[in-house]
Every structure is written in structure tokens, then in C-alpha cells.
Amino acid sequence: MTQEVLILPGDGIGPEITAEAVKVLEALQQKDNLDISMTHDLVGGAAYDQHGVPLAEETLEKAKQSDAILLGAVGGYQWESLDISVRPEKGLLALRSNLELFANLRPAYLFPQLADASTLKPEVVAGLDILIVRELTGGIYFGQPRGIRTLDNGERQGYNTYVYSESEIKRIAHVAFDAAMKRNKKLCSVDKANVLEVTEMWREIVDEVAKEYPEVEVQHMYVDNAAMQLVLNPKQFDVMVTGNMFGDILSDEASMLTGSIGMLASASLDANNKGMYEPSHGSAPDIAGQNIANPLATILSAAMMLRYSLNREDLALKIETAVSKVLDQGLRTGDIWSEGLTKVSTSEMGDAVVAAL
């Protein structure tokens, strides 16, 4: 049965890097009987320029009908002055909330060929392989009430609400425990239970869910310590699970341990493993249109899409092996290039991955 994939290139370097991932998927369609149909549409600033909103209703409808979504990146300088309600990022948030994509999976994996690219000593990061599971549709980013108000004395006050329900915590905990079971059966839950009641409850619920996974070794860590430990001794972690805001920050920190955010994929899943896949980096408007961006994170996001939503683990591994081969050949985009290696463009890197398939 043909599976429907919606391609949303977005803004900045989004169209360039997405084109390379599509190239790889097309090669798999031809050579490996990948039975998918790809449809393209707009999101973010590109959608705002055409429709006046960062996510058109018909695009959302297409997303709901798709088996998976591959997204480039959203945002850019030219939209920063817009009202917050129609900024490009709102298109991304709307997709996540409307599709109930509550689980964000961000691998921080260090390719051995790139050990020197990390700012940490090679011995600290060699063999690094962390999966951060972040709750994506609750917490302080979505809590109500929120806003900016003027008090009686004329002073302005900003306020947000940090809220999680028991069911929201349970379902993300299950995703994290399931991931841990498929990996090294180690889970670290990150909270701020010494200060925030929300995360005090988070810790209690993670412990309750843990009883269903007796084989998984569970550890709890305060977020400030977790941020420190990621730099001090990152290899102690395997799967980490945390709320929306802490996960946003920690996954970016973990990504830089690998030396290039241009290598890191991410998946956002619903309860049935339907998902949206995107690189962990942003839209990088400063290098857009120059054919120099690293497409590997997007290509690896396509691999995650094949693994989690399209049930083609064989083809996911095929892409990951091809990426590794290309790195072995010494090919690098500018962000991961160093002396003695071959610098290639965005499209050349995509072509090399296709050839390595």
C-alpha cells in the first residue's frame, strides 16, 4: 500500500536540504521498492508570504491525511517583526499540537569520523549515543493563562503557566521506557523536583510507570545537574526523558557535543507513531541559497521517518550506512570540514549519499 509523505521545505536553507533528502527517498523508490507518494506544500514564513498565515488550513488537512511529514526548517529575519501569532514558528507549533505529536525524539550520536569536530576532548565524547525524549505539547510553552498585562501601578508583568496532567506525563514516560528497552535499558528522568511542584509530580509518575519496566535502570536528575553532567561526562547517559522546556534546552546542548548540529535528526511522534521529521538545526537564513548547508541531518531525519512511521527499518539502516560511507570517503560540508578533507556543496553531499546507497 502506498504511504503518503508530506514534504514541507519551509524557510531559509529548508528547501535546499529537503531537496537532498527527497533525492535519497526517490533513489530508494527506484532501487528498493519504497512505496511512497510525496506531496510538497508550504509552512512557516513561506506560507505566511503566500497565505497570510504560517500554516494554511488545507496544509494542515494534508498533514492529517499523511502517514509522515518531512520538514526542513522555519523562520528568518524578515518575519521577526510580525505579530507573534503569525510568526513562522507558530506554523510548527500548530502542526505539533493539531497532530498531537507529543513525543520528540532527538538522538545525539557522534559519528566516529567526526570525533575531532566536537569541542570536547575525543576521549570524553567517543562512542557518544544519547536519545533525548522530550514532551512536546504540554508544559510552560502551552499552559494557560499566559500573556503580558499592565498592573494598576502602570508596571508591565509577563506571566506563563507551567502545567502537566498525569496522563501527559504517563504517555511520554512510556515512550521513553519503550525506547530504553530497545537500547541499553537505562533511563534518566530530568526534572526540578526540589523547586517545582509540577516536576515533583513528574518524578512520582515516572517511578510509577517504571514498575512496568523492571529491566530498565532508572535515575532521576535535577535539570541544572543534568546540563552540567552532559558536558562533564556525557557517556553516562543513554535515554533521557524530560518536559518541554527542559528538553528544548538539553537537546540543543547534547547536539553540540557531537560537533555539528548539521548532523542531527529529530522525530516528533503521536500515539500511533505517525510523525513529523526534521533536522535539529534552524533555518540558517545567513547561508540560505548558497548551496553550502549540511543536508545530512535532514537525510538522517528521512531515515528516522522510514524507521518509526513507515516501518522500513531496512531502508533506515541503508541510509545511515550510506551517510557513514560518505564520511569515510572524506567528504564534508563546510560546517564539519577540516584540513585534508574534501569540501562539498549541499547538492554534492546529497549526490554522494545517493551513490553510496
Swiss-Prot record:
<dbReference type="GO" id="GO:0000287">
    <property type="term" value="F:magnesium ion binding"/>
</dbReference>
<dbReference type="GO" id="GO:0005829">
    <property type="term" value="C:cytosol"/>
</dbReference>
<comment type="similarity">
    <text>Belongs to the isocitrate and isopropylmalate dehydrogenases family. LeuB type 1 subfamily.</text>
</comment>
<feature type="binding site">
    <location>
        <position position="96"/>
    </location>
    <ligand>
        <name>substrate</name>
    </ligand>
</feature>
<comment type="pathway">
    <text>Amino-acid biosynthesis; L-leucine biosynthesis; L-leucine from 3-methyl-2-oxobutanoate: step 3/4.</text>
</comment>
<keyword id="KW-0028">Amino-acid biosynthesis</keyword>
<feature type="binding site">
    <location>
        <begin position="282"/>
        <end position="294"/>
    </location>
    <ligand>
        <name>NAD(+)</name>
    </ligand>
</feature>
<feature type="binding site">
    <location>
        <position position="252"/>
    </location>
    <ligand>
        <name>Mg(2+)</name>
    </ligand>
</feature>
<dbReference type="GO" id="GO:0051287">
    <property type="term" value="F:NAD binding"/>
</dbReference>
<comment type="subunit">
    <text>Homodimer.</text>
</comment>
<feature type="binding site">
    <location>
        <begin position="76"/>
        <end position="89"/>
    </location>
    <ligand>
        <name>NAD(+)</name>
    </ligand>
</feature>
<feature type="binding site">
    <location>
        <position position="106"/>
    </location>
    <ligand>
        <name>substrate</name>
    </ligand>
</feature>
<dbReference type="InterPro" id="IPR004429">
    <property type="entry name" value="Isopropylmalate_DH"/>
</dbReference>
<dbReference type="GO" id="GO:0003862">
    <property type="term" value="F:3-isopropylmalate dehydrogenase activity"/>
</dbReference>
<feature type="binding site">
    <location>
        <position position="224"/>
    </location>
    <ligand>
        <name>substrate</name>
    </ligand>
</feature>
<feature type="site" description="Important for catalysis">
    <location>
        <position position="141"/>
    </location>
</feature>
<feature type="binding site">
    <location>
        <position position="134"/>
    </location>
    <ligand>
        <name>substrate</name>
    </ligand>
</feature>
<protein>
    <recommendedName>
        <fullName>3-isopropylmalate dehydrogenase</fullName>
        <ecNumber>1.1.1.85</ecNumber>
    </recommendedName>
</protein>
<keyword id="KW-0460">Magnesium</keyword>
<keyword id="KW-0560">Oxidoreductase</keyword>
<keyword id="KW-0464">Manganese</keyword>
<feature type="binding site">
    <location>
        <position position="248"/>
    </location>
    <ligand>
        <name>Mg(2+)</name>
    </ligand>
</feature>
<dbReference type="Pfam" id="PF00180">
    <property type="entry name" value="Iso_dh"/>
</dbReference>
<dbReference type="InterPro" id="IPR019818">
    <property type="entry name" value="IsoCit/isopropylmalate_DH_CS"/>
</dbReference>
<dbReference type="GO" id="GO:0009098">
    <property type="term" value="P:L-leucine biosynthetic process"/>
</dbReference>
<dbReference type="InterPro" id="IPR024084">
    <property type="entry name" value="IsoPropMal-DH-like_dom"/>
</dbReference>
<feature type="site" description="Important for catalysis">
    <location>
        <position position="192"/>
    </location>
</feature>
<keyword id="KW-0520">NAD</keyword>
<feature type="binding site">
    <location>
        <position position="224"/>
    </location>
    <ligand>
        <name>Mg(2+)</name>
    </ligand>
</feature>
<keyword id="KW-0432">Leucine biosynthesis</keyword>
<keyword id="KW-0963">Cytoplasm</keyword>
<keyword id="KW-0479">Metal-binding</keyword>
<keyword id="KW-0100">Branched-chain amino acid biosynthesis</keyword>
<comment type="function">
    <text>Catalyzes the oxidation of 3-carboxy-2-hydroxy-4-methylpentanoate (3-isopropylmalate) to 3-carboxy-4-methyl-2-oxopentanoate. The product decarboxylates to 4-methyl-2 oxopentanoate.</text>
</comment>
